[in-house]
Curated annotation (Swiss-Prot):
Gene Ontology biological process terms in this record: mRNA processing; RNA splicing; tRNA processing
Function, in words: Usually encoded in the trnK tRNA gene intron. Probably assists in splicing its own and other chloroplast group II introns.
Organism of origin: Asimina triloba
Main localization category: plastid
Cellular component terms per the entry's GO annotation: chloroplast
Keywords for the protein's UniProt record, in alphabetical order: Chloroplast, mRNA processing, Plastid, RNA-binding, tRNA processing
Gene (UniProt): matK
GO terms, molecular function: RNA binding
InterPro entries: Domain_X, Maturase_MatK, Maturase_MatK_N
HAMAP family: MatK
Protein name per its UniProtKB record: Maturase K
Family, similarity comment: Belongs to the intron maturase 2 family. MatK subfamily.
Subcellular location(s) of the protein: Plastid, Chloroplast
C-alpha cells in the first residue's frame, strides 16, 4: 500500500495556501470573462510569458496582472448580455464567483502541467489532444484482443466526495468551503444532476467551473490505470500478484481489505501481465484485454471495489459491461465498432496431394450508425423517420447559393467525421437525402418541380456535395480511376473531428 500511496503523491504540486485572497481581486473576474469569450486554456497563455518552474503566489499574481493589462476588458453598455447585470440576482453573484473560482483553481494545475511537459521536453502541447491516441489504438491493437469492457465513469455518492478529493490536492480551507457552497447551491437549484448525468452536463453559464470539477474527478478515477500501466511497463515478465498483494487495492475500509486479502490469495496468479488497454472519451471508457472472460470479471470486481473503497464512488457492477469482441458491437465516438473474423480457404498442393487450409483473420471495423444518423436528420426536418427526403421550409427565404452551401456543408462535415469508417455506403445514402432535400427546398421556393430544377441547375449543384476528401485523394492518388472509389475503400482518421464531436451525442 505504501508504494501506491507514494505514486499518488509523486506528481502533486506544492500545496497552495493563498488561493482564497485572489477572489477579492476584481481583475480575476475580468480574466474569467475574457476566457469565457475566447474559450482559451490557461497554460497556453502562460507559455507566452516564459515563467520558470518556481510556482508561488507572487508569480501567480504577477501573471494574472500582466494578462489583465494585455487584455483590457471593459464591459460596455452595448454588451449584448447587459440585461444579465440589471438588478441584484443571487444566481448572478454565484455564477460570477464560480467563474472566478474556476480560473483561480486552474492556475496551480496549469503550472504543474507546463512544468511537467518541460521536463519531458514536449513542445507545442496545446496542439495535442488525448483523443488522438484513440485511432491508433483502434487500428493497431483492438483486433488482436478478445474481450472489451464498456465502462461508465462512476459518479460520487455525495457531493462532499468531490470536496474531499480536491482537499487532497489543495489544503486551502476557505476555498474548499466556498467550493462546498457552490456545489450544494447548484444541487438545491437543480442545476447539478450528478445522480444520472455527467457533471459536465450542467448549466452552460457555469460550464467552466463544472468542467474543472469533472475533469479532476475523472483524473482521480483513472489514476489506477496509470499506476498499473507503469507497473506493467517495468514488470513485463513478472507476475502482477506481488503488486496487488502489496497494495491491497489501496483500500481504506478495514473489513474490505480483509475480504480482498482472503478472496484473492488463491487468484493472484491470474493477474500475470494482463496487457490491458484503456481509452476514454467523455464519460465512456473501454478496457480491452487479451485475457479470458473470467479474467475480465476479476478486473471488473477490482475496479468496483477500488472506486468504492478509495473514492467512495457509487460504481454499480451493471455499469461495466463485458463482451467478446468478435460477436459484439459497441458504440464509441459516434461509430458502431466491432471485430469481425474473415474466413478464407487456401488450396495447397504438395506433390500429388492437394488440400484446403481454412484461415481466419480478425479485422476491426468501424461502421456508421445508420438508424441513429437518419433519426437525427429526421429530427432536423431533412427527411422523415423512414429516410425519405423532404423539403425544409425554414430555408426557403434564403438565397439559392446560401441554401446549397448550407446543405453541402452539412454533408461535408458528416463525410469528414465518418471518413474513418470501413464501409461508407451509409454516407452515399446521407448524400442522397441531403441532395434531394436541398433540391426540394429550392423547387418549393421557385414553385417548380424537382426534375425541372435539377435539369436547370446542372453540375454546380453536384459539385457542392463533392467530398473534400475525394478532391484531396485525387491529388494524392492520381492513378486511381475514380477518387470516390478510392475514398470508399480507404479509412482516413482526421484528428480535428473533435470540433464536431456533437455527432457522438446522437448515438
Amino acid at each position: 500500500m505504501e508504494e501506491l500511496q507514494r505514486y499518488f503523491e509523486i506528481d502533486r504540486f506544492r500545496q497552495q495556501y493563498f488561493i482564497y485572497p485572489f477572489l477579492f481581486q476584481e481583475y480575476i473576474y475580468a480574466l474569467a470573462h475574457y476566457y469565457a469569450l475566447n474559450g482559451s486554456i490557461f497554460y497556453e497563455t502562460m507559455e507566452n510569458f516564459g515563467y520558470d518552474n518556481k510556482s508561488s503566489s507572487l508569480i501567480v499574481k504577477r501573471l494574472i496582472t500582466r494578462m489583465h493589462r494585455q487584455n483590457r476588458l471593459i464591459i460596455s453598455i452595448n454588451d449584448s448580455n447587459q440585461n444579465r447585470f440589471i438588478g441584484h440576482s443571487k444566481n448572478l453573484y454565484t455564477q460570477t464567483l464560480s467563474e472566478g473560482f474556476a480560473v483561480i483553481m486552474e492556475i496551480p494545475f496549469s503550472l504543474q502541467l507546463v512544468f511537467s511537459l518541460e521536463e519531458k521536453e514536449i513542445t507545442k502541447s496545446h496542439n495535442l489532444r488525448s483523443i488522438h491516441s484513440i485511432f491508433p489504438f483502434f487500428e493497431d491493437k483492438l483486433s488482436h484482443l478478445n474481450h472489451v469492457s464498456h465502462i461508465l465513469i462512476p459518479y460520487p455518492a455525495h457531493l462532499e466526495i468531490l470536496v474531499q478529493i480536491l482537499h487532497s490536492w489543495i489544503q486551502d480551507a476557505p476555498s474548499l468551503h466556498l467550493l462546498r457552497f457552490f456545489l450544494h447551491d447548484y444541487q438545491n437549484s437543480n442545476s447539478l444532476k450528478a445522480r444520472k448525468k455527467s457533471i459536465s452536463v450542467c448549466s452552460k453559464e457555469n460550464r467552466r467551473f463544472f468542467l474543472f470539477i469533472y475533469n479532476f474527478h475523472v483524473y482521480e478515477c483513472e489514476s489506477v490505470f496509470v499506476f498499473l500501466r507503469k507497473q506493467s511497463f517495468h514488470l513485463r515478465s513478472t507476475s502482477f500478484g506481488t503488486v496487488l498483494e502489496r497494495t491491497h487495492f489501496y483500500g481504506k475500509i478495514e473489513h474490505l481489505v480483509v475480504v480482498l486479502r482472503n478472496d484473492f490469495q488463491k487468484t493472484l496468479w491470474f493477474f500475470k501481465d494482463p496487457f490491458m488497454h484503456y481509452v476514454r472519451y467523455q464519460g465512456n471508457s473501454l478496457l480491452a484485454s487479451k485475457g479470458t472472460h473470467f479474467h475480465m470479471k476479476k478486473w471488473k470486481s477490482y475496479l468496483v471495489y477500488f472506486w468504492q473503497s478509495h473514492f467512495c464512488l457509487w460504481s454499480q457492477p451493471d455499469r461495466i459491461h463485458i463482451n467478446q469482441l468478435y460477436n459484439h458491437s459497441f458504440y464509441f465516438l459516434g461509430f458502431l465498432s466491432n471485430v469481425r473474423q474473415n474466413s478464407s480457404a487456401v488450396r495447397s498442393q504438395m506433390l500429388e496431394n492437394s488440400f484446403l487450409i481454412d484461415t481466419s483473420i480478425k479485422k476491426f471495423e468501424t461502421l456508421i450508425p445508420t438508424i441513429p444518423l437518419i433519426g437525427s436528420l429526421a429530427k432536423a426536418k431533412f427527411c422523415n423517420v423512414s429516410g425519405h427526403p423532404i423539403s425544409k421550409p425554414a430555408r426557403a427565404d434564403s438565397s439559392d447559393s446560401d441554401i446549397i452551401s448550407r446543405f453541402g456543408r452539412i454533408y461535408r462535415n458528416l463525410s469528414h467525421y465518418y471518413s474513418g469508417s470501413s464501409k461508407k455506403q451509409t454516407l452515399y445514402r446521407i448524400k442522397y437525402i441531403l441532395r434531394l432535400s436541398c433540391a426540394r427546398t429550392l423547387a418549393r421556393k421557385h414553385k417548380s418541380t424537382v426534375r425541372a430544377f435539377l435539369k436547370e441547375l446542372g453540375s454546380p449543384f453536384l459539385e457542392e456535395f463533392l467530398m473534400e476528401e475525394e478532391q484531396v485523394l485525387s491529388l494524392i492518388f492520381p492513378r486511381t480511376p475514380s477518387p470516390s472509389y478510392r475514398s470508399h475503400r480507404e479509412r482516413i482518421w482526421y484528428l480535428d473531428i473533435i470540433c464536431i464531436n456533437i455527432l457522438t451525442n446522437h448515438v
